[in-house]
Swiss-Prot record:
Location of the protein in the cell: Cell membrane
Pfam name, any one: PHO4
Chain segments annotated as transmembrane: 1-21, 42-62, 87-107, 112-132, 137-157, 180-200, 207-227, 260-280, 313-333, 364-384, 399-419
A GO MF label: phosphate transmembrane transporter activity
Keyword Lyase recorded: no
Name the record gives this protein: Putative phosphate permease CPn_0680/CP_0067/CPj0680/CpB0707
Function: Potential transporter for phosphate.
Length: 426
C-alpha cells in the first residue's frame, strides 16, 4: 500500500507541475501580450495568486472530480481497482500535458483529467459505474463556458469603446469610468472569497458583505485620486527603457498621446485582473491534479482522512504548480499572449475580466470547466467586437482541434496505465 501512496503523491506533484507549465498561460498570457507585464513579473504574480487560489477555493472542484464522475461505493469496483484507476488517470493527465507542452499544443487540463477518469470507469464497470448525469452537466459547462466568457468580454469591450474610445475626449471619459471599473474588479474578487473555501471560514453575513463593499469603495477612492493626479496624464517623450510607458509605446507606436494615457490606466487595471485571473485559475485547475490523490488517500485511510487533509493536498499541488510555472511556463505564456490576437491593455482587460468572472463562478458552483475554453471564448468575443479579421483563425483551429483530441487521449492513456499499475502493484 505504501509504495502506491508514494507513487500517487509523486504523480500528483508531476501533474501539478505540468499544469503550471501549460495551463497558467491562460491567466497571465494576455498581460504579457499587451505589454503590461514583463515575463518575469507575470510569473511572480501568477505564482503567488495561483497558489492562494488553490489553497482557499480549490476544494470545491476537487470534490466534483473525485467522487461525482465515478461511483466510489459501487460493489462492482474494488477498493484497490479504484485507487489504481485514479492513479492511472492522474498519470495519464500529466503525461498528456507534458507531451502537449513539448509540441506546443494548447490542450485543456480539465478535458484530460475528466476523460481519464471516464476511461478507467469504462474499463471497470463498462460504463455502469459512471455518473453520466454529472458527466452531462460537466459537458454542458464546457459548452457554456466559452459563450459565457465571450459574451462578458464582448460586453465589457463594447462598453469601453462606446463610453471611452469613441468620446471626443477619451482621457476625460476614462477618468470618469476607471474608478467604477476598479471597484467592480475588487468587489467581484471579494464576493468570490466570501462565497466558499475551507480556510477562509467566512460566509455571506452582513459583516462579510459590508467588508466587500468597503473594499470596493476604497478601490474607487484610490483610483479616483490616481486618475486626477498629474502623473496619470503625463507621458514622457523619452520614457525609461523597460518602463510601462516604454513597453506600451513599443507595442503600439501609433497611439496618440491621449489614447496612450487611456491605455496606461487600463494597464494598471489589467494588473488587478491578472491577479484575479490567476486566483480564479488556481481555484479551479489545481483540483485536476489533487482530486485523484484525494480519492486514493480517502480509500486507503478512510478513518484518518479529513477536510484538513484536502487543505494540505491543495497546498502540495499549489507548490507543484508554482515550480512548473517558474521552470517551463514562459513557453506557453508567450504563445497565448502574442499569437492568438493582437492585444492592448484595454482589450486584455476585457479578456481577463470576462474570463475571470466565468472561471470564478464555476469554482463556486463546483463545475470543473476548461480555462482554455473560457479564455478562447473571451478572445473570440473581443475579435467579434473588432471584426473577424482581428483573430488568428489558424491558432483558434488548433485549439478547437485539441479539445476533441484531449478527452479521448486522456481516456486511452488512463486505460493503458490502469492495467500497468494493477499488474505492478497488485
Amino acid at each position: 500500500m505504501l509504495p502506491l501512496i508514494i507513487f500517487v503523491l509523486l504523480c500528483g506533484f508531476y501533474t501539478s507541475w505540468n499544469i503550471g507549465a501549460n495551463d497558467v498561460a491562460n491567466a497571465v498570457g494576455p498581460s504579457v501580450g499587451s505589454g503590461v507585464l514583463t515575463l518575469r513579473q507575470a510569473v511572480v504574480i501568477a505564482a503567488i495568486f495561483e497558489f492562494f487560489g488553490a489553497l482557499l477555493l480549490g476544494d470545491r472542484v476537487a470534490g466534483t472530480i473525485e467522487s461525482s464522475i465515478v461511483s466510489v461505493t459501487n460493489p462492482m469496483i474494488a477498493s484497490g481497482d479504484y485507487m489504481y484507476g485514479m492513479t492511472a488517470a492522474l498519470l495519464a493527465t500529466g503525461v498528456w500535458l507534458q507531451l502537449a507542452s513539448f509540441f506546443g499544443w494548447p490542450v485543456s487540463t480539465t478535458h484530460s483529467i475528466v476523460g481519464a477518469v471516464i476511461g478507467f470507469g469504462l474499463v471497470l464497470g463498462k460504463g455502469t459505474i459512471i455518473y453520466w448525469n454529472s458527466v452531462g452537466i460537466i459537458l454542458i459547462s464546457w459548452i457554456l463556458s466559452p459563450f459565457m466568457g465571450g459574451c462578458v468580454a464582448y460586453l465589457i469591450f463594447s462598453f469601453i469603446r462606446r463610453h471611452i474610445f469613441y468620446k471626443n475626449d477619451p482621457v476625460l471619459a476614462m477618468v470618469r469610468v476607471a474608478p467604477f471599473l476598479a471597484a467592480l474588479v475588487i468587489m467581484t474578487l471579494g464576493t468570490v472569497m466570501i462565497s466558499g473555501g475551507v480556510i477562509l471560514k467566512v460566509s455571506s453575513t452582513p459583516w462579510a458583505v459590508s467588508g466587500v463593499l468597503v473594499c470596493g469603495l476604497l478601490s474607487y477612492i484610490i483610483t479616483f485620486y490616481y486618475v486626477h493626479t498629474k502623473h496619470c496624464s503625463y507621458i514622457s517623450d523619452t520614457p525609461k527603457k523597460g518602463s510601462l510607458t516604454y513597453r506600451l509605446k513599443e507595442r503600439g507606436g501609433n497611439y496618440g498621446r491621449k489614447y496612450l494615457v487611456v491605455e496606461r490606466i487600463f494597464a494598471y487595471l489589467q494588473i488587478i485582473v491578472a491577479c484575479f485571473m490567476a486566483f480564479a485559475h488556481g481555484s479551479n485547475d489545481v483540483a485536476n491534479a489533487i482530486a485523484p490523490v484525494a480519492g486514493v488517500l480517502r480509500q486507503a485511510y478512510p478513518a484518518s482522512y479529513t477536510s484538513y487533509t484536502l487543505i494540505r493536498l491543495m497546498a502540495f499541488g499549489g507548490i507543484g504548480l508554482v515550480i512548473g510555472l517558474a521552470i517551463w511556463g514562459w513557453r506557453v505564456i508567450e504563445t497565448v499572449g502574442c499569437k492568438i490576437t493582437e492585444l492592448t491593455p484595454s482589450r486584455g482587460f476585457s479578456v481577463g475580466m470576462g474570463s475571470a468572472l466565468t472561471i470564478a463562478l464555476a469554482s463556486i458552483l463546483g463545475l470543473p470547466i476548461s480555462t482554455t475554453h473560457v479564455v478562447v471564448g473571451a478572445v473570440l468575443g473581443i475579435g467579434l467586437a473588432r471584426g473577424i479579421r482581428a483573430i488568428n483563425l489558424n491558432i483558434i483551429k488548433d485549439i478547437v482541434l485539441s479539445w476533441f483530441i484531449t478527452l479521448p487521449a486522456g481516456a486511452l492513456l488512463s486505460i493503458l496505465f490502469f492495467f500497468a499499475l494493477r499488474a505492478l502493484f497488485h
